[in-house]
């Protein structure tokens, strides 16, 4: 994405509608969003990656959802190049290879387990 093509308002509107659709179908559902990872666009660093992540995180409080900040968890800007060098990201530096997706799943599992273990049911 080139900077002029990312429209945060449109992005947020789409996510708000998705959240509303989920809540209409399952009113008591807990919703966990996962932010984007760093990436390339047309073989160059995607200048919108941070803006996409920031927009998604802005939904947490007003929409009462949780969000795992995958972008920062993996290292933020430039992390896709590190992941590629380690064999986790594909040559396009947009998609992960199988091991990259496995790594993301393991990281998410670890985050969820830590959150569950630190949860105090006596507090809302």
Model-derived features with residue positions:
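A short helix->loop->beta-strand "cap" motif at the edges of active sites that frequently abuts
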Residues: 26-30
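Active-site neighborhood of glycoside hydrolase catalytic domains
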Residues: 18-25, 111-114
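Catalytic His-Asp segment of secreted/periplasmic serine-dependent ester chemistry enzymes
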Residues: 37-124
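Oxyanion-hole/transition-state-stabilizing segment in secreted/luminal serine hydrolases
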Residues: 1-10
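Structural beta-sheet core signal
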Residues: 33-34
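Generic structural signal for well-ordered alpha-helices
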Residues: 15-20, 53, 57
């Amino acid at each position: 994405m080139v900077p002029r093509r990312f429209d945060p308002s449109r992005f947020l509107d789409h996510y708000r509608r998705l959240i509303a659709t989920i809540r209409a179908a399952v009113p008591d559902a807990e919703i966990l969003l996962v932010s984007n990872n760093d990436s390339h666009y047309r073989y160059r660093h995607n200048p919108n990656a941070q803006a996409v992540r920031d927009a998604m995180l802005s939904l947490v409080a007003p929409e009462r959802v949780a969000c795992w900040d995958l972008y920062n968890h993996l290292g933020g800007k430039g992390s896709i190049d590190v992941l590629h060098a380690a064999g986790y990201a594909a040559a396009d530096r947009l998609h992960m290879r199988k091991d990259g997706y496995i790594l993301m799943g393991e990281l998410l599992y670890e985050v969820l387990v830590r959150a569950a273990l630190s949860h105090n049911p006596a507090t809302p």
